[in-house]
Regions:
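Flexible, active-site-adjacent loop/turn segments at secondary-structure boundaries
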Residues: 13, 22, 35, 63, ...
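Solvent-exposed, flexible loop/coil residues
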Residues: 19, 41, 52, 71, ...
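Alpha-helical metal-binding/catalytic segments enriched in His/Glu/Asp
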Residues: 1-31, 150
Length: 174
């Protein structure tokens, strides 16, 4: 997240829209931070174009995009992947187990970065959420790739004049 911010601040004069970086801690115990944020900012929720979740940043594998049930975003992210110029996964999977969830429930388009193939190979959580989940397990290549790919996506989203991906209504979320 910090590397993405560092990258985008260098290009701030070329960004048409604002970006907000929010870090929530310990989502594993109940998404308290992200839920509280969404509840405390109902008017702001209506203005958000997109929420990118970095819960899986640092895991091995390619750093693609999981669109949480937003198939209309697929052409946009195909363009992002084409700009990046490498083979990246893009898939959709809706799950309530990370900080994107309260935003999704507010109708905001959300995505998480990662690699479904890596997750399948890992089989379970790996070291995650154990006493062995330490900084030496972080894949620095994956972190760099995640920051770079996220920067391309953010730059594209922040510079679109026409955002035709409207938020979902509560009936659509159902």
């Amino acid at each position: 997240v910090m590397e993405l911010g560092r990258t985008l601040v260098k290009e701030k004069e070329h960004l048409k829209h604002n970006i907000r970086f929010i870090c929530f801690g310990a989502e594993e115990i109940g998404l308290y931070g992200s839920r509280a944020y969404c509840e405390a900012h109902p008017d702001f929720m209506k203005k958000i174009r997109f929420m990118m979740n970095f819960d899986a940043a640092g895991r091995a594998g390619r750093q693609g995009f999981c669109l949480h049930g937003w198939p209309k975003l697929e052409p946009l992210f195909r363009d992002v992947i084409a700009e990046i110029g490498t083979d990246l996964p893009m898939w959709t999977q809706v799950g309530p187990y990370s900080d994107h969830w309260p935003f999704l429930l507010q109708g905001v388009a959300t995505a998480t970065m990662g690699d479904p193939d890596e997750a399948a190979k890992r089989g379970g959580r790996g070291f995650g959420h154990t006493k062995f989940d330490t900084v030496d397990k972080v894949d620095l290549r994956a972190m760099r790739e995640c920051a770079g790919n996220a920067a391309v996506a953010a730059f594209k989203v922040l510079n679109m004049d026409d955002w035709s991906y409207q938020q979902r209504t509560q009936a659509e979320i159902g």
